[in-house]
Regions:
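Extended beta-strand/beta-hairpin segments
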Residues: 1-53, 60-145
Length: 145
């Protein structure tokens, strides 16, 4: 394994049902709960929400990196993410992700798609999930294959 550039550490007790999660530096300190849609009381966050924020922020940073390399000014980029919890045939669960990337200063649809594809190749979350979960991407409203 390559030398780590950064290591994040967290401690969780109680899981997603009635849990608590905290990063080692205290920057994140959250109650973990079952989503209201699944019978929870909606008084905390859940792993899917945390994954949605993490993936979207990581993807936006990856996009900024590839845009800089390609000498493109992307302006105010926004990434909307959706993380869906799905059942599996084995009575387990899996997730799927949708990332809707808005690049308002990139009017050329082909260029927007090229940037999003390039970001998907370098994003650590994309690399970690590739081949394991379904990830649907859109660039300025245009779905990518």
């Amino acid at each position: 394994m390559a030398k780590a550039l950064y290591t994040a550490r967290a401690h969780v007790t109680g899981g997603r049902i009635n849990g608590h999660g905290r990063t080692s530096d205290g920057a994140l300190d959250v109650a973990l709960r079952v989503p209201k849609e699944l019978g929870g009381e909606d008084d905390g966050t859940n792993p899917e929400q945390l994954f949605a924020v993490g993936y979207a922020s990581c993807f936006e940073s990856a996009l900024a990196t590839v845009a800089r390399r390609m000498k493109e000014d992307t302006g105010d980029v926004a990434v909307e993410s959706a993380v869906m919890l799905l059942p599996t045939e084995e009575r387990g669960f899996k997730i799927a992700v949708e990332l809707d990337v808005s690049l308002p200063s990139i009017e050329d649809a082909a260029k927007a798609v090229e940037l999003v594809r390039a970001a998907h190749r370098v994003c650590p979350y994309s690399n970690a999930t590739r081949g394991n979960i379904d990830v649907a991407l859109t660039a300025n409203g245009q779905p990518l294959d």
